[in-house]
A protein has these predicted regions:
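An alpha-helix initiation/capping motif
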Residues: 1, 58-62
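Short alpha-helical elements of helix-turn-helix
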Residues: 1, 33-36
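Thiotemplate assembly-line natural product biosynthesis machinery
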Residues: 1-16, 69-75
């Protein structure tokens, strides 16, 4: 499953609109609970783990991708 598919699946958001500049304010369902659901799905899918600071700093799709790349994940 691609990162875009994963994001779209968690938020019920059109996959083609998943762009780096997309932030939590533009996705109505991106609240704190959904954010943690997304993090759990990402960690399970890519077999890695974010730090608490990384999770707190994720405010956009671009932030998510940057953190994934820092963990060696190609997205």
């Amino acid at each position: 499953m691609s990162f875009e598919q994963l994001f779209a699946d968690v938020f019920g958001f059109p996959q083609e609109l998943v762009k780096d500049e997309l932030g939590f304010r533009e996705v109505p369902r991106w609240d704190s609970l959904a954010h943690m659901m997304l993090i759990a799905r990402i960690e399970d899918t890519y077999e890695m783990q974010f730090t608490g600071d990384e999770i707190a700093d994720m405010k956009s799709v671009g932030d998510l991708r940057k953190s994934l790349r820092a963990h060696g994940v190609t997205v």
